[in-house]
Amino acid sequence: MDFYITKEEIVSSLNATLGVVEKRQTLPILANVLFEVDESTLRLTATDLESEISTISTISNFKSGGRTTAPAKKLSELCRLFKEGDEIHFFLDGDNLKIETSSGKYNLSTLPSEDFPVFEKEEGGNTVNITGPNLKALIYKTSFAMGNQDWRHYLNGLYISVEDNNITSVATDAHRLALSLIHI
């Protein structure tokens, strides 16, 4: 794996994935982000085994593809320190991810990409298109009633149903009940 990417691209992608990087580190691999590189794109994936976020960024110069994992928090903190507009060179050297910029050379330990848990993608499932603002409104209008770290895990989430061109979201903490409906 050997490629170049701008600071802005990598920082944006890392920031998007940091929300699901495991903080308790029950498994060391969950503190890492998965790198997948092909001719024109970098896919970063992070998971906490409940949620998974993947981002796709455009790379500026491709030398070789590949897969690896690197510590998400350390990588994010490091990339934020680079100069605006910097082009960052990432490449694998054995079990290490080497990073070179105009300001210096850095080295991060990696874990094998084969150990990274990836959700199975369902083929041929039903899909629903919804705008970002509509989804945000749907969640906002019901999320206040969700349980927060309740021992009854089924109360800690949001129920979403799609029927007859309507999307309904429902949440409860056993004391409050919230329902929101959007026509699509």
State where each predicted segment sits.
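Structural preference for solvent-exposed beta-strand-turn elements
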Residues: 1-182
